[in-house]
Amino acid sequence: MAWSSSFLFIVLPLAAAVAVQPQDTELTFLLPAGRQECFYQTTLYNGSMEIEYQVIGGAGLDVDFSVTTPSGILLIMERRRSDGVHTVEPTEAGDYMICFDNSFSTISEKLVFFELIFDNQQGDEEPDSWADVVEPDELLDIKLEDIKESIESVKSRLERSIQMQTVLRAFEARDRNLQDSNLERVNFWSAINVGVLVTVAFLQVYMLKSLFDDKRKIRT
């Protein structure tokens, strides 16, 4: 079985050198027939990783999906699925392997979309240097901590909205590909039906005409 691998953290050149918070990632790729594609994503111990995938193109709209820990433990294994959502709570830091397998298909390639969403507590804690600049008596009954919480809440909701819009775009792409495939099938079989109808019509005219042809010889 042919397979290949990719590293998602190559977009972050310093990710391999220092422990940084993983960034949310989304990717759409073409999975050839009879192939397996694996991606490696670095995760932190105290965070969570949400994986969502959809097959948006290709016959059957299905792939095999698996997630393996850095130590080689198989966490998730799904066969012939068109989509899925999984939340992984990393029990060990390192590179998790995410694989999509199309080896069961010998002809059809698949267009696959997947997204990784991270929730790491340590990455959200930023130094509040701005809070040390303003004295408490200068806050005028407005707590800077409340303002910060409101901003963080708005930021979190906006990020979630972006993620949902990305997922909806993937659904729309899959539905559009499915409609295009159905349109081709409808046009193909409609053309065959028209051809059959025209052939039957000519045969009926020919047979009716032959019934009225008097081929008997007339004696004089």
From Swiss-Prot:
Pfam families in the cross-refs: EMP24_GP25L (PF01105)
Protein name as catalogued: Transmembrane emp24 domain-containing protein 1
Gene: tmed1
Domain GOLD: 36-118
Quaternary data: Homodimer in endoplasmic reticulum, endoplasmic reticulum-Golgi intermediate compartment and cis-Golgi network. Interacts with IL1RL1. Interacts with RNF26; this interaction is important to modulate innate immune signaling through the cGAS-STING pathway.
Keyword Signal: yes
Native species: Xenopus tropicalis (Western clawed frog)
Residue span of motif COPII vesicle coat-binding: 211-212
Compartment(s) of residence: Cell membrane; Endoplasmic reticulum membrane; Golgi apparatus, cis-Golgi network membrane; Endoplasmic reticulum-Golgi intermediate compartment membrane
Cited PROSITE patterns: GOLD (PS50866)
Any one GO cellular component localisation term in the record: endoplasmic reticulum-Golgi intermediate compartment membrane
Cytoplasmic side: 209-220
Coiled coil location: 138-164
Motif COPI vesicle coat-binding, chain ranges: 211-220
Signal sequence, start to end: 1-19
Single biological process term from Gene Ontology: protein transport
Ranges in the topological domain labelled Extracellular: 20-187
Spans through the membrane: 188-208
Similarity comment text for this entry: Belongs to the EMP24/GP25L family.
Keywords: Cell membrane, Coiled coil, Endoplasmic reticulum, Golgi apparatus, Membrane, Protein transport, Signal, Transmembrane, Transmembrane helix, Transport
